[in-house]
């Protein structure tokens, strides 16, 4: 909470604080969650690489980075001889997929990176709980978030998923 941005000082301080809170010696997978326009990417890449070199982190991951910035991170890591990310975490699901499949998936395949999506169930919408465009009317903590997907196109996807499930006795 006290750490903002991805400067070298912030990255190391946040990792050390996480290790202390966890009571652990090493973090298995450490994410850069958002690109930081105020810090040169080379500084961020070097900082994450140093965490791996120093044994505080086993692997690096990036989340919410554009394909161009992921490619730039990889190039910088190779140039510096530091650890490359092994995971990309995009917002990806059946409702939000075209830009990911067009650009990020080919990059991940080419560079042998894993994809670990967030909002895989479209904030709960793809569970099938919401069957109309008034999803926000549900009195649940997640209903408002799921409501953005409760469109005619979204409901068509739910209907298709239900038909597939029914065909398989699910």
PLM-predicted stretches and their roles:
Residues 5-22, 43-46, 70-75:
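Short, acidic/polar
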Residues 19-40:
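Active-site groove signature of glycoside hydrolases
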Residues 35-170:
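Beta/alpha (TIM)-barrel catalytic core signal, keyed to glycine-rich beta->alpha loops juxtaposed to Asp/Glu
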């Amino acid at each position: 909470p006290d750490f903002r941005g991805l400067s070298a000082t912030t990255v190391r301080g946040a990792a050390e604080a996480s290790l202390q809170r966890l009571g652990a010696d090493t973090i298995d997978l450490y994410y850069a969650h958002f690109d930081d326009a105020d810090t040169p990417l080379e500084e961020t890449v070097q900082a994450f690489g140093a965490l791996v070199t120093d044994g505080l982190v086993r692997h690096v991951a990036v989340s919410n980075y554009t394909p161009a910035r992921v490619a730039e991170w990889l190039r910088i890591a190779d140039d510096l001889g530091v650890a490359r990310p092994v995971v990309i975490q995009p917002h990806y699901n059946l409702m939000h997929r075209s830009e990911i499949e067009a650009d990020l998936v080919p990059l991940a395949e080419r560079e042998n990176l894993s994809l670990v999506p967030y909002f895989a169930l479209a904030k709960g919408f793809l569970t099938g709980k919401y069957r109309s465009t008034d999803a926000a009317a549900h009195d649940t903590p997640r209903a408002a978030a799921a409501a953005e997907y409760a469109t005619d196109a979204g409901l068509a996807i739910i209907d298709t998923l239900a038909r597939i499930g029914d065909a398989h006795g699910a």
